[in-house]
Amino acid sequence: MLDVVWLIPALPLAGFLILLFGGRRLGEPAAGWLATLCCAGSFAASVVVYAGLLGESEEGRHFTQTLFEWVPVGALQVDVGFLADPLSITMALFVTGVSTLIHLYSIAYMHGDGDFPKFFVYMNLFVFSMLMLVLGSNLLVTFLGWEGVGACSYWLVSFWFSSEANATAGKKAFVTNRIGDWGFMLAMFLAFAAVGTLNYDELFAGVENIAPVTATALGALLLLGAVGKSAQIPLYIWLPDAMAGPTPVSALIHAATMVTAGVFLMTRVNPILAAGYEWVPDMIAWIGVITALVAATIAVAQNDIKKVLAYSTVSQLGYMFLAVGVGAYVAAIFHMIAHAFFKALLFLGSGSVIHGLHEEQDMRRMGALRRFMPLTAVTFMVGWLAIAGVPPFAGFWSKDDILLFAWGSGGADAKVLWAIGLVTALLTGYYMSRQVFMVFFGDARWAGTAAPSSAGHGGEPADEITPGAAGDAGEAAVAADPGTAAAAHGPAGEHAEPHESPWLMTLPLVMLAVLSIAGGVINLPFNDDVDFLEHFLEPVLGENEAHIAVPTGTKVTLAVIAVVAGLIGIAVASAVYLRRRVRAVEPEVLAHAWYYDEEVSAFMGGPGRKSFDGIAWFDAHIVDGAVNGVATVVRAVGGRLRSVQSGFVRSYALGVTVGVVVVLGYFLTRLSF
């Protein structure tokens, strides 16, 4: 059963190739159905391999399949192969499962788009690349998938490239990720220099024999790659702008799969982190918890329905980094899976709202949609309760695990990490409740040309909102382009009554809602008081997993405190945006994301540009000048010598004569003295 692991990435690759060369001929909706079936087949193959692993003993849950030798260069021997172990197959299951639902949703969402087949070409290629990333048996194959998802992200974010904002957002995502990719590449060079291999099995066995400072440097470089891909401080600025792509792209790439690649990488290389100094895990924890808090504060003041979810994603990824930093690797994977369920649900739900409102994304022009889109509203609220950490939804169990490990990690800063995580949980309950109340409750603000500046500003009118002004780089920006799905849905701000989405869009919402409710069971104890997911991942993560000693009473107390924090956030949002008893406070500094993006842009356009110009001048005049100078000298000397080779016998005879005279003169002079 394990031998079919190659089929998991092969099916999306086959779908990509078929659609690349025959997508136009297949047309709509056949191209979408083919892409969806390829993902579904990949999910089925993942289930088969998963069942095969369950049938093995814990020691036997490790299978490497080599397809061919890729790089046979001296000591560097790299194969294209797949590693089927509990971690990789867990990732493959939720990547292919969620991807299948998003592909199904996209068939209806992208209906009428002039580039319908091309969209699914990119989507299948992305799924293939993501599976290469998680299944690769060595760092180089993982890096191949790593770069593949980055390229697909660029193509999909800027899919509606007729809008300059979309094209710019795609470039921003691509360039920002290059910084992290630089760290990943340096890590591969260092790993080969220190251990002599890039294969995971040999690398993890050999890392115990290298100096701690080398292991620390290796972990720090890999962390740089993870920070870029998973949108952590300071490289998070690309993710909110990436909402410019079609909403299914936001759900697939920027919520459920690609952005979790950094967390997966840090979890995969846990032996390297364990072999180095403790300051690298500490740094991971602090990067995560600060990112979680900062992104949550930004989310409370956003009005674009997708921007709220974007900053929420950055915040939840911060929780996962916190888990990795305190050694709670299972909790990180658990929250990654739960987050994939409820965040994909929330993004697809927002897409359903945007579709039903004819491409409107500004929450100030929504309201009362639960009466017109009941199924979307109910499923969206399931995702809301899950991310807010309300039991028994999936987010409660996974977030509680992370906060528990932060509390019991034993470090001097353990309680501080826990406290910041708790405040973030409160803010999460607040901003997600704000979104739900603004979109689905209150007065219908979509029917007029003016709306309250926020749903809870005491009902005071605000400046008129231009139809379609919702997303500064979203679907509304291209609604007028006849070649886009936005045009098929209708122009933003159109005063038609909102409508529920078709069944191809609502069916994935229902299935993801069920997973968001029941997803927590995957890490509940079933036998011998051992959590299922923890037991399954034991062969990969057990050796370096943190073990904490927290009394049962303390665990219950911490869980109750976390739930109460989320409920306080919900209650405050209710008072402000639902019952309107309190005037909303949305500082401009938060609406502008602490002006961090502006400062980065100003630096890149000012001092940064001058620095880069200086580097370019140094490269052109000093580095290239030295190389070109040597060539110029050699060329000049050669030109002078070339004149000696005249081709005339008399010239050669003269040269010989002069040479003989010089030699004789030299010896005569020596003999005279």
What does each model-found stretch correspond to?
Residues 1-4, 22-121, 193-212, 237, ...:
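Transmembrane helix-loop-helix hairpins at membrane boundaries of multipass inner-membrane proteins
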Residues 59-77, 199-207, 398-405, 409, ...:
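Membrane-interfacial helical/loop segments at transmembrane boundaries in membrane proteins
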Residues 75-95, 214-226, 417-425, 546-569:
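Hydrophobic alpha-helical transmembrane segments
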Residues 446, 455-467, 471-568:
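Hard-cation-handling environments
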Residues 37-54, 180-189, 380-388, 508-528, ...:
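Hydrophobic alpha-helical membrane-insertion segments
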Residues 28-42, 171-181, 371-380, 499-514, ...:
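Alpha-helical transmembrane segments and their helix-start/interface "positive-inside/aromatic belt" motifs
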Residues 100-145, 151-494:
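Hydrophobic transmembrane alpha-helices and their helix-loop junctions in integral membrane proteins
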Residues 74-83, 503, 514, 525-561, ...:
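Aromatic-capped, Gly/Pro-kinked transmembrane alpha-helices
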